[in-house]
Swiss-Prot record:
Organism, as annotated: Mycobacterium sp. (strain KMS)
Binding site for dimethylallyl diphosphate: 63, 96, 146, 244-246, 289
Protein's name in the database: 4-hydroxy-3-methylbut-2-enyl diphosphate reductase
GO molecular function: 4 iron, 4 sulfur cluster binding; 4-hydroxy-3-methylbut-2-enyl diphosphate reductase activity; metal ion binding
EC number: 1.17.7.4
Binding site for (2E)-4-hydroxy-3-methylbut-2-enyl diphosphate: 63, 96, 146, 186, 244-246, 289
Similarity remark: Belongs to the IspH family.
Function: Catalyzes the conversion of 1-hydroxy-2-methyl-2-(E)-butenyl 4-diphosphate (HMBPP) into a mixture of isopentenyl diphosphate (IPP) and dimethylallyl diphosphate (DMAPP). Acts in the terminal step of the DOXP/MEP pathway for isoprenoid precursor biosynthesis.
Length: 333
């Protein structure tokens, strides 16, 4: 295998050069599972080991078909609403977080709850609560109806307005333009979010920024890696599910960064051979909720089509690990 091409950050927009001619794959690093997804999936696995099936999970634990199907076969039961869980049963809240009303509903049904909310989502929840206490108008940049946005907005429903995209800014009104802050969903396109914020700031010049970045490190890192390789690719394949916000954003980022085409696939079988007509360089990455086994399947399929040379394109090294929820942590010996 050719050596890793370490683009680094901030040099992510530089050209990828590896000295390889002919068909090749540029493989984005980092890709796949982030710390929050790893924690959430392991939470369900540990809950099943500790309590046995069934373990109920409110919403998909993460937005990936393979992961959800695998956990369902192991005994996880996925439900949309809390009242679908039998009284007294165990329920896991997904990585996307829930509104406070969901905790109240669970307590009323005497459910044993395990909260697998990503700590970075919890951070945004805490910001919403803090600024609501100070009576700010909170402009939450995010996708209307996404579980994470519903949960964050639920922390302060009287103070939060969801701003779905840059064009939605025109409809935003606030009580006091000097007490406005923006927060964001953690899985958005960095570029589109900044465009939305730019327009908000034009309208509200004293708009405050979040205390720290709300778009998570993994979302940003995966977008940077795609930006690094996309200019060299005629095609970028993003492994991920259609309901995965961060995976869909990677397709958009690839197209915006110069790839001629970009497609989202759940499995290797989803690759249409006609996509490869006239293509020399294929970029491959995966969303933050995608296990590596699915990427390996895509690489194997591409090798069958003659793309056996794989060059990693590294823009960051991720080492972050989140502690498991206390309810399912291993007992100390």
């Amino acid at each position: 295998m050719p050596p890793t091409i370490n683009m680094g950050i901030p040099g992510a927009s530089s050209s990828v050069t590896g000295g390889v001619s002919g068909k090749r794959v540029l493989l984005a690093e980092p890709r796949g599972y982030c710390a929050g997804v790893d924690r959430a999936v392991e939470t369900v696995e540990r809950a099943l080991e500790k309590h046995g099936a069934p373990v109920y999970v409110r919403h998909e634990i993460v937005h990936n078909r393979y992961v959800v199907d695998t956990l369902a076969k192991a005994g996880a039961v996925f439900v949309e609403q809390t009242d679908e869980v039998p009284e007294g049963a165990i329920v896991v809240f997904s990585a996307h977080g829930v509104a406070p009303t969901v905790h109240v509903e669970a307590a009323a049904r005497n459910l044993k709850t395990i909260d697998a909310t990503c700590p970075l989502v919890t951070k945004v929840h805490n910001e919403a609560k803090r600024f609501a206490r100070d009576d700010y108008d909170i402009l939450l940049v995010g996708h209307e109806g996404h579980e994470e946005v519903v949960g964050t907005a639920g922390e302060a429903p009287d103070h939060v307005q969801v701003v779905d995209n840059p064009d939605a800014v025109d409809k935003v009104t606030v009580r006091d333009p000097d007490k406005v802050i923006w927060l964001s969903q953690t899985t958005l396109s960095v570029d589109e979010t900044m465009e939305t914020v730019r327009r908000l700031r034009e309208k509200f010049p004293t708009l405050q920024d979040p205390p720290s970045d709300d778009i998570c490190y993994a979302t940003q890192n995966r977008q940077v890696a795609v930006k690094a390789m996309a200019p060299e690719c005629e095609l970028v394949i993003v492994v991920g599910s259609k309901n995965s916000s961060n995976s869909v954003r990677l397709v958009e980022v690839a197209l915006g960064a110069g790839s001629d085409a970009a497609h989202l696939v759940d499995y290797a079988e989803d690759i249409d051979p006609t996509w490869l007509n006239g293509v020399t360089t294929v970029g491959v990455t995966s969303g933050a909720s995608v296990p590596e086994v699915l990427v390996r399947g895509v690489l194997d399929r591409l090798a069958e089509y003659g793309y056996g040379t794989v060059q990693p394109v590294t823009t960051a090294n991720e080492t972050l690990v989140f502690a498991l929820p206390r309810e399912i942590r291993p007992a100390r010996s």
